[in-house]
Each structure stands twice: as structure tokens, then as C-alpha cells.
């Protein structure tokens, strides 16, 4: 639950007090390396990823992601330094201080809606960040809940000084700005679909359960750091998931896995390997890997 001091630091330009959440404590520590693996496992896993790309649902997800990217402008958002700082601070505080109340899916949808708001209207003053942040978060709660979100409970848990009347006002401001176009396919929702498919491979079933658990913790920690950073908003969720998972495997088992099958899994439809779209995506995926590797290096 956010206390009043956290609310103040979020929305009124006061530096947040550093604290470590339970999630950070669990995930803290260097990404570890392991012994070499059999090349047969590597080749088999590569084939597994290539086959997953043929799953109709994967293609449907990628098409939805493409549409989502058309609703934001990475260049506009990354040029807005004040917005980038407040966005990262909002993500960090909600992630660290609202465990059990704000799900990761809700958080990511709220951030995506906020990105859309500041794309549609880049001139939103810094002093109005609170209005759009709260409005987007309340809408995200509604989108991810199977029940009506109680306005009073929302305010008590996330913005104690806010009245339910103003909460309704903030929600309407966001809805009007976005013309009620609020559908978001979030990274957590894609991850919940894609990860079980990836882990169906016999390679992961052959690992001790504690190794898989640790791998998931380290992957989550890496993903959280990526999602905080505004530089990654130009990438689709499947791209981030595939690139970050390859980076993690590369750290644990250096040079054991080819990155191309991971690239293929998140690739846009093309007419062949020489197609211009394929080449563009290859360069894009390579750049993404390098950026994520930098973050992994800082976490090590």
C-alpha cells in the first residue's frame, strides 16, 4: 500500500525514498552460470521454438502487438525527459510498494495507457502527471478485474488524499483523450501464454525444479528492469520476452543456444530470409539483445 509520502514523491517531484521490496530481496544477486549442455538439447530446443511460431495463437498475438505499437510514439516519449523520469518512478513505486494489490498485468496496462496519453498529447504539463497516472491505473484495474473496482478502496490503497469524485473525473479525462481506445495486450499476459509453451520442451523438464524456479526468478528480475526503462517501449512484448530469455540462457550456458530461433519466434510474417522485413527485424532484434545485455551486466 502506498503511504502519503509515496504518493507525494510520485506526483509532486520529490525524490522517492529508497527501499527494498520482498520481490527485490528474492531476486537480488548475480545471474549465475552453469555447466555446458549437450548440443542435442540445444538443437532440439531451437526446433521447438521454430515450431511454436507456427501456432496460430502466436501469430494472432504478434498482430495485436503490431496494432498496439501504432498507438505510441517512442521518439516523442523518449524526448520528454520529465515524463520518462516520472514514468520510471511510477513503475518502481507501484511494483515495490503495492504487492498483493496491483498485479503486474494491471501495472503494465496502466503504463501502456499512460504512454498513449503522452503520445496523443505531448504537451501535458508535468503538474498534470498525477491526473493521467491515476486515471490510467484505475482503468487498468477495471480491465484486469472480474469484479467492479470499488472507488473508495482504490483511493484508500493508492491515493489516500484523492476523492472518489476526482477519481471519476481523472478516468473520464483519460478515456476522452484516448477516444475510449483502451485495449492493451500487455507483456505479462503474453508471458503467461508463451512461457508454458516454451517450457514444454524436454530440456526444461530435465532440469531440477529448483533450477527452473531460480531461472524464472532471474528472468522476472531482468524483465522488470527492462519494463521500467522507456527505451524499450518501441519493442513488442514477444520481442522483449524472446530476447531477454535468450540473454538469460546465454549467461547461464554461454554459446549453447543460437539466438536466431528466438528471433524467429517473435518475428513478423515475411516472404523469405532475404525479405527486407526479415533483415529489418534481424537488426532490430540484435539491437534489443545488446540493450538487454547491458541491463543484465548491471544486475550481475
From Swiss-Prot:
GO cellular component: cyclin-dependent protein kinase holoenzyme complex; cytoplasm; cytosol; meiotic spindle pole body; microtubule organizing center; nucleoplasm; nucleus
InterPro entries on file: Cyclin-like_dom (IPR013763), Cyclin-like_sf (IPR036915), Cyclin_N (IPR006671)
Protein task: Has a role in meiotic chromosome segregation.
Molecular-function annotations in GO: cyclin-dependent protein serine/threonine kinase regulator activity
Keyword Nucleus annotated: yes
Pfam families: Cyclin_N
Coiled-coil zones: none
Name the UniProt record assigns to this protein: Meiosis-specific cyclin crs1
Alphabetic keyword roster: Cell cycle, Cell division, Chromosome partition, Cyclin, Cytoplasm, Meiosis, Nucleus
Organism: Schizosaccharomyces pombe (strain 972 / ATCC 24843)
GO BP term, example: positive regulation of meiotic DNA double-strand break formation involved in reciprocal meiotic recombination
UniProt keyword Zinc present: no
Domain Cyclin N-terminal span(s) in chain numbering: 61-183
Compartments (UniProt record): Cytoplasm; Nucleus
Protein family according to the UniProt entry: Belongs to the cyclin family. Cyclin AB subfamily.
Major subcellular location class: cytoplasm
Amino acid at each position: 500500500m502506498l503511504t502519503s509520502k509515496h504518493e507525494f514523491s510520485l506526483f509532486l517531484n520529490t525524490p522517492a525514498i529508497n527501499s527494498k521490496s520482498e520481490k527485490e530481496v528474492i531476486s537480488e544477486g548475480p545471474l549465475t552460470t552453469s555447466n555446458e549442455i549437450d548440443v542435442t538439447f540445444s538443437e532440439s530446443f531451437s526446433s521447438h521454438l521454430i515450431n511454436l511460431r507456427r501456432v496460430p495463437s502466436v501469430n494472432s498475438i504478434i498482430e495485436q502487438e503490431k496494432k498496439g505499437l501504432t498507438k505510441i510514439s517512442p521518439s516523442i516519449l523518449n524526448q520528454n525527459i520529465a515524463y520518462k523520469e516520472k514514468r520510471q518512478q511510477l513503475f518502481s513505486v507501484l511494483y515495490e510498494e503495492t504487492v498483493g494489490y496491483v498485479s503486474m498485468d494491471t501495472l503494465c496496462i496502466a503504463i501502456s495507457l499512460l504512454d498513449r496519453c503522452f503520445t496523443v498529447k505531448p504537451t501535458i504539463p508535468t503538474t498534470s502527471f498525477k491526473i493521467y497516472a491515476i486515471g490510467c491505473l484505475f482503468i487498468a484495474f477495471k480491465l484486469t478485474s472480474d469484479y467492479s473496482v470499488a472507488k473508495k478502496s482504490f483511493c484508500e490503497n493508492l491515493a489516500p488524499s484523492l476523492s472518489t469524485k476526482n477519481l471519476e473525473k481523472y478516468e473520464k479525462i483519460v478515456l476522452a483523450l484516448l477516444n475510449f481506445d483502451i485495449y492493451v495486450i500487455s507483456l505479462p499476459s503474453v508471458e503467461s501464454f508463451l512461457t508454458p509453451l516454451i517450457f514444454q520442451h524436454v530440456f526444461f523438464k530435465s532440469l531440477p525444479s529448483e533450477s527452473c524456479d531460480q531461472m524464472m526468478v532471474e528472468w522476472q528480475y531482468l524483465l522488470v528492469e527492462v519494463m521500467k526503462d522507456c527505451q524499450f517501449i518501441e519493442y513488442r512484448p514477444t520481442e522483449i520476452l524472446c530476447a531477454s530469455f535468450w540473454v538469460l540462457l546465454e549467461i547461464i550456458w554461454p554459446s549453447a543456444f543460437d539466438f536466431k530461433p528466438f528471433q524467429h519466434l517473435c518475428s513478423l510474417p515475411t516472404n523469405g530470409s532475404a525479405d527486407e522485413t526479415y533483415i529489418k527485424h534481424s537488426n532490430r532484434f540484435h539491437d534489443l539483445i545488446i540493450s538487454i545485455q547491458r541491463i543484465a551486466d548491471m544486475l550481475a
